[in-house]
Structures are given as structure tokens and as C-alpha cells.
Amino acid sequence: MGYLDLALSYSNQPQTVEAPASGGGLSQNGKFSYGYASSAGKRSSMEDFFETRIDGINGEIVGLFGVFDGHGGARAAEYVKRHLFSNLITHPKFISDTKSAITDAYNHTDSELLKSENSHNRDAGSTASTAILVGDRLVVANVGDSRAVISRGGKAIAVSRDHKPDQSDERERIENAGGFVMWAGTWRVGGVLAVSRAFGDRLLKQYVVADPEIQEEKIDDTLEFLILASDGLWDVFSNEAAVAMVKEVEDPEDSAKKLVGEAIKRGSADNITCVVVRFLEKKSASSSHISSSSSKEAKEMPPLGDLAISSNEAKQVQIGSGNKPENVTNRKPDTASRSTDTLTLERNSVTDKV
């Protein structure tokens, strides 16, 4: 959610809300499992996107997870989903200086998006909340108000900051650049946009930057899980309440589905997308964190090359008002098959697009 007119974009008439689309998987090294769920909620259109991706880089398994909440249309969020992580993992300093690589990838992706939008005389934008798992490091970056929260030692800890125009440092930056912040239902940049950092937003780019804030956490046996979600969840959940709910459900896909379903029940008026990553430092690779719908277990596999499996390379479903699910043929049958010898056990991967 971002632009002023989006606040009125859903109907007040009773609507049938479909069950969230969901899926998940387990890393081949058994160090983490993940699940996701996504729903248009009460809205007639879907502008949330997400990515769950596991790559083998220099013989090391790397996890990349992201939630992207579009405004002014779905184009920007879809673009960021498709390009951000590809730009990141090809950065020459991705392993050696991950934070610098993330900053460069965010800004490069934004620059390329703006070129695309400008050539078509269009303007759309997107938040991003991303989590990169590299070795024993969790590196979280964000622009906008899609939030990242971890549970460490049983406590909820925000590892991102919502970028809002009324925050003193953000307001000062905007005003120093020649912009202004005014109240229009909530505080907005130029009276229009409710976030102060985002991808895209061509007409406000001088004030609405895509420079990410980055926070790093050590992955150890006190780090239990991570929640990434769009503001459709956080509008009706505190950090503590979300963490408490995930604690009750061992499987990350079921956790994500429960959060999204409960957000709908609580009256969230926005699209809702959630990714849950569980860290399995104390558990073996055969841990039961895989969804109960899958009876397969990860097997030992050959040494890794530069292997990539992402949520948009497996079976995809298009969800939205009036659209039937669309099956997309897997583009990498040799690496993204349903065999237990794959790098990750992917299930029901979803592209949440309208």
C-alpha cells in the first residue's frame, strides 16, 4: 500500500476471500526450512510479490528471501522480484562484502526499473524486505514498510525499520531535497506516498530513495526463525503477536498460512504476504519442518555448482479476481525437478500476480 488512491481501491461490498496460496521447502544442508503464504485479502487486485530462492555459490548454499509490496500497480513489485536477487548474486563482492553488494544491487535495480518506467511514461513503486543467508550470517535489508522480525531466545526483535515520511530523519532528508511531507489520512511524501523509501516512484524519485537500511544477525542456536511480511500483516499484528503465533506452529508453511489467515480475520484491508524461515542449527536435515503433505526427505546430493532454484522456476499459480490458476512449465527440469536429489524441496511455488 502506498499511493493515496489505493486507500479506496477495494470494494465495501462483501467479498469471498480465497485461501492463501502457499508453499515451502528445506535447504539441502538442513540448516533452514521456509514457508510462504500470500493472499489478495479483501482487495480485488494483487500487488504483493515474493521470492524464495536457494543458490549454490562457490560451493556454499545461500538462501535469498524477499517480500515486495507494490503501489500504483503491480509492475514495480514484479520487476524487483524478477531482477533484484539476480543482480545481487552476480555482484563481484556478494560473498566478500555482502552489505555493499546489497546496496549496489538495490540501487542498480531501481535505476533499471526507472528506465523501464520512463520509456513507457509510467510510474509505479514497490517496497522490499529481503533476507540473505550466507554462512552463519543473516543479512536483512529493506526500503519501505514491509517488515522483518526475528525470534531470538524467544523474544521478538525487529531487524528492519519501516520507512515513513513522518520519521524525523526521513522528513529532514526529504525536505533537504526540496520535497515536503503533509497529512492526507496519514503522513505522505508530497501528500501522495505513505512510504519514504521505495523502488520506482519516478515522479517522486528525488525524495523517495531506494537506499536500503541493512542489519546483520549471527545465525546461532539462539536464532529461531524470521518473519518477512508486507504491511497487510503488520497493520493488524504486533511483532510480538506474530512471533507468538509462529512459535505455536512448527512447520513454516503452516505458520505463514496461519498468520495470513488470521490477518484476514482481523480485518486487514490490504494484500497480505508472509515468508517464514526457521533456523535448524539444533536439528538434523531430516527434521520434520517440511510440510506434512510431503513424505520425501532430502538425500545427499553431488557437489554444488552454481545452481539456482527459485520460486518462479517451479510450478507457478496466478491468483487474483476473476483469474484461474495458471500452470507454468518448469524452465529447469534438470535442477528444479521434484526429485529428492534437488538442492531444495520446493512445493507449490507461487507467483502472486494480478
From Swiss-Prot:
Pfam families: PP2C
Record PROSITE patterns: PPM_1 (PS01032), PPM_2 (PS51746)
CDD domains (alphabetical): PP2Cc
Region (Disordered): 289-354
Gene Ontology CC annotation, any one: plasma membrane
Cofactor: how bound: Binds 2 magnesium or manganese ions per subunit.
InterPro entries in the cross-refs: PP2C, PP2C_BS, PPM-type-like_dom_sf, PPM-type_phosphatase-like_dom
Cofactor(s) listed in the protein's UniProt record: Mg(2+); Mn(2+)
Residue spans of biased composition, Polar residues class: 309-328, 336-348
Binding site for Mn(2+) 1: D69, G70
Entry keywords, A to Z: Hydrolase, Magnesium, Manganese, Metal-binding, Protein phosphatase
Binding site for Mn(2+) 2: D69, D231, D270
EC number assigned by the record: 3.1.3.16
Gene Ontology MF: a single term: metal ion binding
Reactions accelerated catalytically: O-phospho-L-seryl-[protein] + H2O = L-seryl-[protein] + phosphate; O-phospho-L-threonyl-[protein] + H2O = L-threonyl-[protein] + phosphate
Boundaries of every PPM-type phosphatase domain copy: 33-279
The keyword Manganese belongs to this UniProt entry's keyword annotation: yes
Family, per entry: Belongs to the PP2C family.
Protein name: Probable protein phosphatase 2C 69
Lineage, opening ranks: Eukaryota, Viridiplantae, Streptophyta, Embryophyta, Tracheophyta
